[in-house]
Amino acid sequence: MGNSQTKEFRPPLSSSNRRSHQWGSSSSHGRSPYSDRHHAESSRSRGSRPDLSILGIGGSSERDVATLEHRRETKQEREARRLEKERAARVKERERSMREEHVDGGYLVTQGVYVGTEDFNKAVTRQLMIERRLAPFWRGLNDFSESWTEHQLMAAARGLPIPPPDEIPPELEYKNPPKLSGDGKEPSIQHLMVPITSRSQSYGSEASQSSTPAHSLPAPVSPIASGTSTSPLFRSRAKTLASLTTSKLGSQSDSTPKEIHLPEDPFVNGQPIEAYLYKDATECPICFLYYPPYLNRTRCCDQPICSECFVQIKRPDPHPPEHGEAEPNAAAAEGDRQDNQDCQLVSEPAACPFCVQPEFGVTYTPPPFRRGLVYATDPTLRPNFTSPVSSTSSLASANASPGTGRRRATSLSANDPAVITTDRVRPDWAQKLANARAHAARRSAAATALHTAAYLMNSTASGNESRNFSLGRRGVMRRTGQSETPSASSRSGSPALQALAFLTDRRTPGHDTDSAEEGTGNLAPPRNSSRRNRIDDLEEMMMMEAIRLSLASEEERRKKAEKEARKEAKRREKENKKAEKAARKHGFYSNNASSSALDVPSDARLGRVASTSSSITGEDASPSKGKEVDRTSPAATAASSQSSTEIASESMTINPHPNVVEQGPSAQSSMAQLSPRELPKPSHLRQVSSASSSFSSLVESTGEDHSGAYDGNASSTEPLFNFRSLAAVIGDEDKGDGTAEHVEDTSSKPSAEGSASSTAPVADEMPGQSTTPADPIAVKTVAEDRDCLMPKELETQSVEITSATRNAEATT
């Protein structure tokens, strides 16, 4: 006692020390069979306190752990031991029942046709068989022939080898029936008649029990001692069997009448009872064994079926309703359940194996004789009978109409008193259904709770926000204040999703205006709310979850469509760029800018024009600033200078008249196609630049000497890349004031005006003037490439128009 108190207040030892104390104490007290080896191990592992085992401190802990281990082993093996014990008891009881009990030559226990679990109610089945409302368990024959003799039928019924027809084995020999004297007729007549109430006690007497031999019964039946059938010992053994194999609900200790044995009579009408039963054997259509013709008959289609097959037919396991049907035969205890629970499990009644009609049941017509067990018909016990048909009435009906009558032409109702349904031999089906429903409800509630907790914790959390999953009882239904009141910017998705997430917060009105610093919000319903409110809340949340999923799928579909549209636009843009690049390459290589003679107008009345346009708009400005090394050879530079001089002199020679303007579209097109990214040789670009410089100086030198009229519709080639004619610019100048004007971004002007001015005839053209026709190939190239090249290459051009040019236009 002191050791156990010390153990309670002492700090818990380590597992190794505790184990060492246990084995050490067991070695000192001699309880362990492995004391020597474990004592050595405990001496090594005890450490600094080897004297505890000597004092016996570890004894109590050893007893506790040993008891705990023993209890654990018993708990694991208890179910197996119980099942084994019940199986042994059933085997023993079966042997005893087959040896001592029978009903009209049949048995009250199964014959081993089915080896599965016998889950039917054996007490109810026994009572129905004794009342002759259900056929007993006949012994089935594997083979049968109508030509068999009596001793062959007896051998087949007892399970012995079938002898030849003309040979009778010694064990099958039977004595002749008793002499039909006056003393012998009376018992047989009494056995075939309804038992008289005043003489019912004499059937249990010793004289009536021992008056007939028992050697010719289907099984070796020993005479029972006097008073055994009515003694408490016999009834207690039957009740013990019922208590071992049935539930508490099936025990009918108060309503079960007394069982009595009729006098043993192995003969019926002078024949052995086996020969009388099996001479007209009938095959069971389910197990294909041959039985006496006194079998059960289905109530619906009047088909024979043995009792061993009948007790195997039962209701299917509880399952969800199929095709929306409701259970018609619910138990009375199930009637008070809520109607809104439409997803409960149901248990359908068993169907007939022949015609598949529900509410399977059978009827039984017993043979015209009585042997074995019957219920006593004491008047004091008659009011306690719970069955509508007693053994007396069944005996009377059996004597009135034997089983060889005409086949029934109509089916019987399942509620008929003579019908035994499968629910009768399994009355616990309602309890099994209730247990299955309760189990399903618990599983559904657990799953709903998990889904609800996960939904509440993740409804308003953003995708990148870390989620805090708390699995505690209170933490499952709560979140921190930061996750409960997130900002609008932290939520991803459409406004509809944000609104739905806000609705699913399920906060109380008092918490809607609270800040995030107030702590945890009450997401779960109050504890005092009813179960109905919780169910409604769960249904509402499930509906919101469905709406949220629908909106999320729609949002995902919309994003996917936008992504596809962006991909298509990008693909089209890439194709356009490829086409433009191909067009540029085609225009550049088809028009040689260096080989075209830049047609220079010889009109001296152009005035002083200062061109500030660059040679190529897309060209980088770094070469003009001296930041790049000049890689052009001196020969190329000299060639470019010579080419520019030849251009100026040739233009002055070809156009001697001052007011004749020669348009060179090929020069415009070829110069427009030049680009620093597409030029194959940098020397060509420098040659064009040198020509531009020479031509600019030429225009400035000739502008002072010529002051004649100028045709506004005639356009000349500007220094290199001015694709708009000066005549169009001068025409725009007339619409403005008299001051100088800088024209920027001339690409915005209509290109048709320049084209018209380039092709219009000169109004005041003198005789002898001739205009050089433009190259048709160059004109076509300009028309094709002007739209895509002009906006990029004319942004940096500016033209300054002097007063001399304006006066010339006015004079014209």
Swiss-Prot record:
Question: What keywords is this UniProt entry annotated with?
Answer: Cytoplasm
Disulphide bridges: none
Q: Does the keyword field hold GTP-binding?
A: no
**What broad class describes the main subcellular location of this protein?**
cytoplasm
Q: Could you tell me where the Polar residues compositional bias lies? A: 244-255
Enumerate the subcellular locations listed in this protein's record, separating them with semicolons.
Cytoplasm
Q: Where is this region: Disordered?
A: 1-97, 159-187, 200-232, 244-266, 317-340, 384-412, 507-533, 554-718, 732-778
Cellular compartments per GO CC: cytoplasm
The organism sits in which domain of life?
Answer: Eukaryota
Q: Where is the composition biased (Low complexity)?
A: 14-33, 200-211, 387-401, 632-651, 689-701, 748-758
Give the compositionally biased regions (Basic and acidic residues). 34-44, 61-97, 172-187, 317-326, 554-582, 732-747
Record flagged with keyword Calcium:
no
Q: What does this protein do?
A: May negatively regulate the snf1 kinase.
**Family assignment?**
Belongs to the SIP5 family.
**Name listed for the protein in its UniProt record:** Protein sip5
Question: Which species does the entry assign this protein to?
Answer: Aspergillus fumigatus (strain ATCC MYA-4609 / CBS 101355 / FGSC A1100 / Af293) (Neosartorya fumigata)
Gene behind this chain?
sip5
